[in-house]
């Protein structure tokens, strides 16, 4: 999904940095271009369910965000 936008090494490093629950820092991870990929239903909004699966946009095997991480992302 991010082919041509982010390098595979950058994606792997970012996922490695937030493997542990409650370690996801959206300010360090989020980029404007990512919005259009995360907005899976192309509604122009990113819903909570789309945020929970945010890391899986980068890699299908990545974990879902915790409720706390999702709420922090929404702030």
Curated annotation (Swiss-Prot):
GO terms for molecular function: calcium ion binding. InterPro entries: EF-hand-dom_pair, EF_Hand_1_Ca_BS, EF_hand_dom, Parvalbumin. Residues 26-61 form the EF-hand domain. GO terms for cellular component: cytoplasm. Belongs to the parvalbumin family. In muscle, parvalbumin is thought to be involved in relaxation after contraction. It binds two calcium ions. Keywords: Acetylation, Allergen, Calcium, Metal-binding, Muscle protein. It comes from Merluccius gayi. Ca(2+) binds at residues 39, 41, 43, 45, 47, 50. Is regarded as an important allergen. The modification N-acetylalanine is found at residue 1. It comes from the Eukaryota. Pfam families: EF-hand_6. This is Parvalbumin beta 3.
